[in-house]
Amino acid sequence: MTIETTTKKRPRAARPPRPRESDAYLETVAGLLDVRDKTGYIRTHGYLPGVDDVRVPHAQIRQYGLRPGDHVVATTRKPYERLAEVESVNGSTDWRNRPDFADMTPIHPRERLRLETESVTSRVIDLFAPIGKGQRGLIVAPPKAGKTMVLQDLAAAITRNHPDCHLMVVLVGERPEEVTEMRESIHGEVAASTFDRPDRDHTALAELAVERAKRLAESGHDVVVLLDSLTRLGRAYNNLAPGGGRTLAGGLDAAALLPPRRFFGAARNLRDGGSLTILATALVETGSRMDDNLFEEFKGTGNMELRLSRALADKRLYPAVDLDASGTRREEILLDPQEHQLTWRLRRTLGGLEKQQALELLTDRLRETPSNAAFLQQVRQTT
């Protein structure tokens, strides 16, 4: 006789639920999005790579509609390989339908950046090379002509007269002590890669800075970027050029001109947005043919030029501005008709004098008058 036995299956023990990653494990990070080879990194400490940077996969960049230069606030978990959630982009929680900088219409600068302060330097610039929102300007400077002082005066004037503008100072290949001086003397964003850092850092810093400026401009902000210097940025790209391409005089690789040209060309006044003003220094009379060629390449791309004179600086005449060689294209858009007529009359009067005599006369008269308006009235009465 066969006895059938049935074995009752024991119910499988329920697998304990996986521990849920609670919000207690989330960390909030904030920084600028830098995209390299389709992979993004949130730079949490400035513009250069750091140990606490957060990796953002390309899929998440597309998912959230992020762009290089965005200031992102997000949550993440260690080991910082992806984001958990994006909370805001450039201070906004509604960023997906924003306009694209490349699709916006550039127009001539129409709104003037008033630079006049107690400083004679800013008053001279305001008279002879007026700057508008969206200007693309070159500050052409030989060594020891006072370009750093000019930049500091420009930064101080913009901060004081236009606190609504977002000021960015980009220093490429500068001395560390000058970076410190700039950070302590201005109220604005300072992004710096000192001369002892590799060329790759110089170019990465500049690229992220201009993308940051574009994101602000397309959002309706007025941005002013002071770059020191366009020449050193061009040198860095030239050193990183792969070689084998067309080489210009002075050992300048033709391919190395495109990235700094793209940086400088980003300056524009946007019809339906904000504006991006770029004032960049260009070094001349350095004894390097490469520097001269870099300047010649950018000479015709700007719409404003302020030229400094080594001869005037050697005589301790500051600001060492070459008045005849400095000026702004389409300045009549920025100036009212009477002011435009008086500045032309002033130019003709000073143009008949030697450069040293003209600058001394101008600066003396400016110090005697409380404002440029009062000075121009004096010009009207005496010429």
From Swiss-Prot:
EC code(s) of this entry: 3.6.4.-
Gene Ontology MF term list: ATP binding; ATP hydrolysis activity; ATP-dependent activity, acting on RNA; helicase activity; RNA binding
Disulfide bonds: none
Biased composition (Basic residues): 8-17
Binding site for ATP: G132, K133, G134, Q135, R136, G137, K144, A145, G146, K147, T148, M149, R175
This protein's record includes keyword ATP-binding: yes
Gene3D superfamilies, per database record: Nucleic acid-binding proteins (2.40.50.140), P-loop containing nucleotide triphosphate hydrolases (3.40.50.300)
SUPFAM superfamilies in UniProt: Nucleic acid-binding proteins, P-loop containing nucleoside triphosphate hydrolases
Residue segments, region Disordered: 1-22
Cross-referenced InterPro entries: AAA+_ATPase (IPR003593), ATPase_F1/V1/A1_a/bsu_nucl-bd (IPR000194), NA-bd_OB-fold (IPR012340), P-loop_NTPase (IPR027417), Rho_factor_ATP-bd (IPR041703), Rho_RNA-bd (IPR011113), Term_rho (IPR004665)
Keyword vocabulary terms for this entry: ATP-binding, Helicase, Hydrolase, Nucleotide-binding, RNA-binding, Transcription, Transcription regulation, Transcription termination
One matching Pfam family: ATP-synt_ab
Quaternary structure annotation from Swiss-Prot or TrEMBL: Homohexamer. The homohexamer assembles into an open ring structure.
PANTHER family the record matches: TRANSCRIPTION TERMINATION FACTOR RHO
Annotated function: Facilitates transcription termination by a mechanism that involves Rho binding to the nascent RNA, activation of Rho's RNA-dependent ATPase activity, and release of the mRNA from the DNA template.
Protein name as it appears in the record: Transcription termination factor Rho
